[in-house]
From Swiss-Prot:
Family of this protein: Belongs to the ferrochelatase family.
NCBIfam families: hemH
Protein source organism: Pseudomonas fluorescens (strain Pf0-1)
Reactions catalysed according to its record: heme b + 2 H(+) = protoporphyrin IX + Fe(2+)
Record's GO cellular component terms: cytoplasm
Keyword field contains Glycoprotein: no
Protein's UniProt name: Ferrochelatase
EC number: 4.98.1.1
GO biological process terms, semicolon-separated: heme biosynthetic process
Gene3D superfamilies registered for this protein in UniProt: 3.40.50.1400
Organism taxonomic ancestry: Bacteria, Pseudomonadati, Pseudomonadota, Gammaproteobacteria, Pseudomonadales
UniProt xrefs under SUPFAM superfamilies: Chelatase
Pathway assignment: Porphyrin-containing compound metabolism; protoheme biosynthesis; protoheme from protoporphyrin-IX: step 1/1
Subcellular location: Cytoplasm
Source organism, top-level taxon: Bacteria
Length: 341
């Protein structure tokens, strides 16, 4: 029996659309120091304030996009897991969520108990960020350390510029981009600017000029989420043969009053509508599975906002989800994952 297991990890979801389940999920998510990178007392106070109203608001949003089978993110991730079982021939393929269930700890313990001493951990995030990639890796390391697991852990690296990922993205999006449209907006998840500046290895590059991300050195690019997003967008546009002016980049899901990376998706939708754009396509390449940020934030609220600003039609291009070419690409990428523990 082969013993090289694969553990796919996505963000997670509330167990249901009930306010109690959403509150529990948001508390776990927002109390992660890699998500809100403030000292514990400040973070606890801030999250407590957020949890006064946000759970009810978010529960309503989740209910508007919830499927009969459950959370779209979890359902689509499980479908990808099934696709991966045919692509990953070295051992079992399990699925974990960083927040909620099934947890990273539960799955690591399950795999080790079954005799698998080599596991590839696959954070399903194309671009690197502490709040996504790092927190998954650190949680896995915590489990290995605290449970004293005898296991070799390899970790899938960010794949924002890898040909396999880009080719799958192009193949998935092409049918949608063959229709008539005025503009393509590539909307990535946003982050507070401080999440980027604190990782700048030079200490004097991030946000020092408008083209800092375009001119990032290899050392800066390795940990700069915004630069990686722009690189993904540019490589995608190049592969699709999109002319300048036909596409642009924005960042969504801003939370709180801190300065986040720009341009903001909400502002960009208004600008495009008021500039005469009538039909817009929106892709969300930071997500490999459709979720509340794509289906509700863009597909529902973004569509309404665009129309109110003067646009006529917003079409959300689906994420990679369980696309067979994406599953094949992911298996290839995981084959190259370097040893971490």
């Amino acid at each position: 029996m082969t013993d090289h297991a694969l553990l796919l990890v996505n963000l997670g979801s509330p167990a249901s659309t009930s306010v109690a389940d959403v509150r529990r999920y948001l508390n776990q998510f927002l109390m992660d120091p890699y998500v809100i990178d403030l000292p514990w007392p400040v973070r606890r106070l801030l999250v407590s304030l957020i949890l006064i109203k946000r759970p009810e608001q978010s529960a309503h949003a989740y209910a508007s996009i919830w499927w009969d089978e459950g959370s779209p993110l979890v359902v689509l991730s499980r479908r990808l897991q099934q696709q991966m079982k045919a692509q990953w021939t070295h051992g079992p393929v399990e699925l974990a969520m960083r927040y909620g269930e099934p947890s990273i700890e539960t799955n690591l313990l399950k795999l080790v108990a079954a005799g698998h001493k080599r596991i590839t951990l696959a954070p399903l995030y194309p671009q690197f960020a502490d709040s996504t990639t790092t927190t998954v890796i650190e949680e896995a390391k915590r489990v290995v350390r605290e449970k004293k697991l005898d296991v070799q852990l390899s970790v899938l690296q960010p794949f924002y510029d890898q040909p396999e990922y880009l080719d799958a993205l192009v193949a998935s999006a092409r049918p949608h981009l063959q229709q008539d449209y005025d503009h393509l907006l590539l909307s990535f998840h946003g982050l507070p600017e401080r999440h980027l500046t604190k990782l700048d290895p030079t200490g004097n590059h991030c946000f020092k000029n408008e083209d800092c991300c375009k001119n990032a050195s290899a050392a800066v690019l390795a940990t700069c989420y915004r630069a990686q997003c722009l690189r993904t967008a540019a490589l995608f546009a190049e592969r699709m043969g999109l002319p300048d002016g036909k596409w642009s980049v924005s960042f969504q899901s801003r939370l709180g009053r801190a300065k986040w990376i720009e341009p903001y998706t909400e502002a960009r939708l208004d600008e495009l509508a008021k500039s005469g754009v009538k039909k817009i396509l929106v892709m969300c390449p930071a997500f490999v599975a459709d979720c509340i940020e794509t289906l509700e934030e863009i597909g529902d609220r973004g569509k309404e906002q665009f129309r109110e600003a003067g646009g006529e039609e917003l079409v959300l291009v689906p994420c990679l989800n369980d696309d067979p070419q994406w599953a094949k690409a992911l298996a290839t990428l995981c084959e190259r994952a370097p040893l971490a523990l």
